[in-house]
Amino acid sequence: ARGPKKHLKRINAPKSWMLNKLGGIWATRPSQGPHKLRESLPLSVLLKERLNYALNGRDVTLILNDKEGNVFVDQKVRRDKGYPTGLMDVVRIEKTDQSFRILYDTKGRFVLKSLSKEEAKYKLLKVTAKAIGPNQIPYIVTHDSRTIRFPNPEIKIGDTLKYDLVNNKIENFAHLESGNVCYIQQGNNIGRVGIIQHIEKHQGSFDICHVKDAKGNAFATRLGNIFVLGQGKKLYIELPSGDGVRETILEERKRKFSY
């Protein structure tokens, strides 16, 4: 077996896709792109399983291969049915005039948050690397593999940028520090939202971040799992229903049977 893998069995697909186990043998394997395989949602799954715009792969191909371009990810036309969309990406469907932001719910499943035309013009980026390139040009790399040259010198690794997709400019940024609202992007607490209480430094190991949600529930996670959502309590984006507060088993049961 030389070269890259080209197939993905449905039973081995990420749980976040919520695929029907009996819906066939295969799932669309995401192409190489800005997000990792297990942290992405390919366009074909998004169109078939989430938006119900297509019944099969042929329908997906017809939608994506529209002459003028029908599906835009971060303001760019995408025609590859395996293109990996991921956290904070803005997906626009031209024919239906709809825009969505890709987020996780509190159970770690991908959800699409509907956006207005103004909200669809920007996205949030987490800074993952910072360096100085050839000719002493400073640059930063973000979680969706963007390279931005000549950033504000105050921006550090772990900070969040509010990025204008139309003009390709950084509008604003928020530091990874106590008092800011954050979103958990990985781990057991994925999808939860809360305010950073304090950060424990552990030399040679993982730094731990303590967070408290809107209901006062406290939890801790690795610092690398934190995605800052804004400065203080002011959010740069709108959250999906539930506002990132995880229900207990009893609360969920009560909600389901309260009809």
From Swiss-Prot:
The modification Phosphothreonine is found at residue 248. One of its GO terms (cellular component) is cytosolic small ribosomal subunit. It comes from the Eukaryota. The modification Phosphoserine is found at residue 258. Keywords: Phosphoprotein, Ribonucleoprotein, Ribosomal protein, RNA-binding, rRNA-binding. GO terms for biological process: translation. PROSITE patterns: RIBOSOMAL_S4E. Residues 41-105 form the S4 RNA-binding domain. Gene3D superfamilies: 2.30.30.30, 2.40.50.740, RNA-binding S4 domain. One of its GO terms (molecular function) is structural constituent of ribosome. Belongs to the eukaryotic ribosomal protein eS4 family. This is Small ribosomal subunit protein eS4.
